[in-house]
Swiss-Prot record:
<dbReference type="GO" id="GO:0005829">
    <property type="term" value="C:cytosol"/>
</dbReference>
<dbReference type="InterPro" id="IPR004368">
    <property type="entry name" value="TIF_IF1"/>
</dbReference>
<dbReference type="InterPro" id="IPR003029">
    <property type="entry name" value="S1_domain"/>
</dbReference>
<comment type="similarity">
    <text>Belongs to the IF-1 family.</text>
</comment>
<feature type="domain" description="S1-like">
    <location>
        <begin position="1"/>
        <end position="72"/>
    </location>
</feature>
<dbReference type="GO" id="GO:0043022">
    <property type="term" value="F:ribosome binding"/>
</dbReference>
<keyword id="KW-0963">Cytoplasm</keyword>
<comment type="subunit">
    <text>Component of the 30S ribosomal translation pre-initiation complex which assembles on the 30S ribosome in the order IF-2 and IF-3, IF-1 and N-formylmethionyl-tRNA(fMet); mRNA recruitment can occur at any time during PIC assembly.</text>
</comment>
<dbReference type="GO" id="GO:0003743">
    <property type="term" value="F:translation initiation factor activity"/>
</dbReference>
<keyword id="KW-0648">Protein biosynthesis</keyword>
<dbReference type="Pfam" id="PF01176">
    <property type="entry name" value="eIF-1a"/>
</dbReference>
<dbReference type="InterPro" id="IPR012340">
    <property type="entry name" value="NA-bd_OB-fold"/>
</dbReference>
<protein>
    <recommendedName>
        <fullName>Translation initiation factor IF-1</fullName>
    </recommendedName>
</protein>
<keyword id="KW-0699">rRNA-binding</keyword>
<dbReference type="GO" id="GO:0019843">
    <property type="term" value="F:rRNA binding"/>
</dbReference>
<dbReference type="InterPro" id="IPR006196">
    <property type="entry name" value="RNA-binding_domain_S1_IF1"/>
</dbReference>
<keyword id="KW-0396">Initiation factor</keyword>
Length: 72
């Protein structure tokens, strides 16, 4: 899947789950399961409930995503 195929959305982290998974509520109101991207994991970026994040969604599965950015 190329970079052009992903859907980027903004959301808020609701809760932290095991294995670096997070429950994220998108601006549209949908709740998805998201994991941290490799760059955030490598640089030890902490993500806590209440943080605003940017999530990439695959057009094939809109219930799972990848957190690519944490807003300051």
């Amino acid at each position: 899947m190329s970079k052009d195929d992903v859907i980027e959305m903004q959301g808020t982290v609701l809760e932290s789950l095991p294995n670096a998974m997070f429950q994220v509520e998108l601006e549209s109101g949908h709740k998805i399961l998201a994991h941290i991207s490799g760059k955030l994991r490598m640089n030890f970026i902490r993500i806590l409930p209440g943080d605003k994040v940017t999530v990439e969604l695959s057009p094939y599965d809109l219930t799972r995503g990848r957190i690519t950015w944490r807003a300051k």
